[in-house]
Amino acid sequence: MNGQNIRIRLKAFDHRILDTSTKEIVSTAKRTGAQVRGPIPLPTKIEKFTVNRSPHVDKKSREQFEIRTHKRVLDIVDPTPQTVDALMKLDLAAGVDVEIKL
């Protein structure tokens, strides 16, 4: 697999779970002999929702909720077949979304 890179994008609502997952991926890749670039933190996406507190009166009384989506990018340079097998068998936390591009 010479000259090929694996790009892994991770997304999660909780940054602590995201950081532990990136540490697991980095340690697994380094253990199998691959070179890792990252983790690179991407900008956090913040979605805000504003709703009325009461159903029909007091328009000025509102409440805001937000969802923060934290993101990280990892590049694995020149992965070995053992690296790919180890990454496929890796079990990450339930709240982490993983996108892998070859």
Curated annotation (Swiss-Prot):
One of its GO terms (biological process) is translation. PROSITE patterns: RIBOSOMAL_S10. One of its GO terms (cellular component) is ribosome. InterPro entries: Ribosomal_uS10 (IPR001848), Ribosomal_uS10_CS (IPR018268), Ribosomal_uS10_dom (IPR027486), Ribosomal_uS10_dom_sf (IPR036838). Keywords: Ribonucleoprotein, Ribosomal protein. GO terms for molecular function: structural constituent of ribosome; tRNA binding. It comes from the Bacteria. The keyword Ribosomal protein applies. The keyword Ribonucleoprotein applies. PANTHER family: 30S RIBOSOMAL PROTEIN S10 FAMILY MEMBER. Part of the 30S ribosomal subunit. Involved in the binding of tRNA to the ribosomes. Belongs to the universal ribosomal protein uS10 family. This is Small ribosomal subunit protein uS10. It comes from Beijerinckia indica subsp. indica (strain ATCC 9039 / DSM 1715 / NCIMB 8712). The lineage of its organism: Bacteria, Pseudomonadati, Pseudomonadota, Alphaproteobacteria, Hyphomicrobiales. The gene is rpsJ.
